Amino acid sequence: MSARQAAHRERGSRSIGLDAVAAGGVIALGAAFAIGSALRPERKSDPVHRRATRKARDGAAILGASVLMDSAMEHFRGGFHNRAMVLAPATAAASIAASLAEPRPDRTGRLPRLGHALSFAVGAAGLGFHFYNVTKRPGGLSWNNLFYAAPLGAPGALAISGLLGLTSEALSIAPVDGDRTGNEALAWSLPEAGRGLALATGGSLLVTAAEAGLLHFRGAFHNPAMWLPVTVPPATGLFLIGEAANPTDSGREVTRWAARGVAVLGVVGTAFHVWGVHRNMGGWHNWRQTSLAGPPTPAPISFTGLAMAGLAALDALGSEERSS
């Protein structure tokens, strides 16, 4: 067999492999949404409470979907050389299903919490794997390794998805009227759950913006729009942390508009990344190569998921003034 024929066969097998990964990611995404929706019955509760809970859980699900597709593509590019690399997309799918499922009083209610806890644990372990991948290379924590080795903060998105899911669980079971009886005796009140979610979301926005800043710095901020993910989300994260510490009507309204801007930014950023893939040679006609070489298309929508969780936190924080 000639070298040209061998190269052609290798490209063909890789193309088939990427097709399988893409199809598997879509199937896993659809299955996660279907399973989670089936476990999500309508609940009779205060409209504000129900709306805040849905926003928080939908935000965690969107973040999980971003992690599922992004980790599947990036780990495929790495050839899944470590078998543990399969855990990231698999756990992200479980996180989506857990985020869409409503907590129940029976034993089935433990499954969503287990899914969120597993996502957090796998994401935290992934941070260790990626840190080792960066530091084991010549030069250690150098700019070159931070740019081109395993993305240092990427597994944190999976951990954040699990953290938001666990916090949304606390928000979901929070007693609305302040009376804590039975299973709610140890639960947070709705404003307390809102503060916890605001802190978790605010910190997550800061960390996610730092990861985006590193990669956009690698791209030399060649497009002025690349500054938006490193300015708007961190400011919103600080606003959320401030509201968690000292909630006010005026501050909450400013933070709400900032969070809406972050949600829009996630959609616009996805469009920019889709265009970035298109600009590579062959565009989307050559998606098997350009989708791996271009900017990660599933990444920006994570900002939308975090923004929804932030809006849920603001709704819960506002309940304190409405109930007083």
Residue ranges and their predicted role:
Residues 1-324:
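Short amphipathic, positively biased membrane-proximal segments
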